[in-house]
Amino acid sequence: MSNSRPAHARKAEIVAEIVSKIKSAQGVAIAEYKHLTVAKMTELRVQALKQNIDIKVYKDSLVRRAVEELGLVDLIPFLTQQNVFIFSNEDSISAAKLVANFAKKNEALKLKAGIYEGKVVDTAGINEVASLPSKEELYSMFASSLLYPLRKVMAAINAVAETRN
C-alpha cells in the first residue's frame, strides 16, 4: 500500500471500512488486549478464522468517527486502551462467544462491549450475549425436544412388550 496519498484520505478510507464492517456484521465485540502476547493474539486470530469471524485492530479515534457516523455514540466510552474489534458475519453471538471463551483462559483479554441486534451493549450485556446458545446448540435442543415424545412412546411400547413376555 502506497503512502503517497494524504493522511486524511487514508484515514477516511479506514473509517469507511469500519462503517462497512459494522453495517455488514451480524454481531460485533470489543475487547481490550493490552497485555495479550503476540502468540495468544495469533491463537485468537486462528480460532476466529475457523469460525469465519474477522478480527481487526483499529485506532480508537477512527472507530469513534465511524460509530458517530452510524449513530452508535453509546459505544464511545468503551473506546479506550488497546482494543481489538471482532466482527461476526454469520450470526449475532459468535463474536462475543469467541472472545468470552478465549478470555476465560487468557486474563489479558477483557471483553468490554459490543453491538448486538444493532444496539450497543455494555460489558454485562455482551457477556450475556456470549452465554446464549449458538445456532448449532439451538438446533440440537430443538431436535432433542422433537424426539422426546417419540422416546416416551417407544419406552411405553417396550414396557408393554416386556409385560407380555
Swiss-Prot record:
Any one GO molecular function term: large ribosomal subunit rRNA binding
Recorded GO CC terms: ribonucleoprotein complex; ribosome
Coiled-coil region list: none
GO biological process entries: translation
Disulfide bond entries: none
InterPro entries documented for this protein: Ribosomal_uL10 (IPR001790), Ribosomal_uL10-like_sf (IPR043141), Ribosomal_uL10_bac (IPR022973), Ribosomal_uL10_bac_type (IPR047865)
Superkingdom of source: Bacteria
Xref: Gene3D superfamilies: 3.30.70.1730
Annotated keywords: Ribonucleoprotein, Ribosomal protein, RNA-binding, rRNA-binding
NCBIfam families linked to this entry: PRK00099.1-1
Its job: Forms part of the ribosomal stalk, playing a central role in the interaction of the ribosome with GTP-bound translation factors.
Protein family per UniProt: Belongs to the universal ribosomal protein uL10 family.
Subunit text: Part of the ribosomal stalk of the 50S ribosomal subunit. The N-terminus interacts with L11 and the large rRNA to form the base of the stalk. The C-terminus forms an elongated spine to which L12 dimers bind in a sequential fashion forming a multimeric L10(L12)X complex.
Name assigned to this protein: Large ribosomal subunit protein uL10
Organism of provenance: Mycoplasma capricolum subsp. capricolum (strain California kid / ATCC 27343 / NCTC 10154)
Organism phylogeny: Bacteria, Bacillati, Mycoplasmatota, Mollicutes, Mycoplasmataceae
Encoding gene (name): rplJ
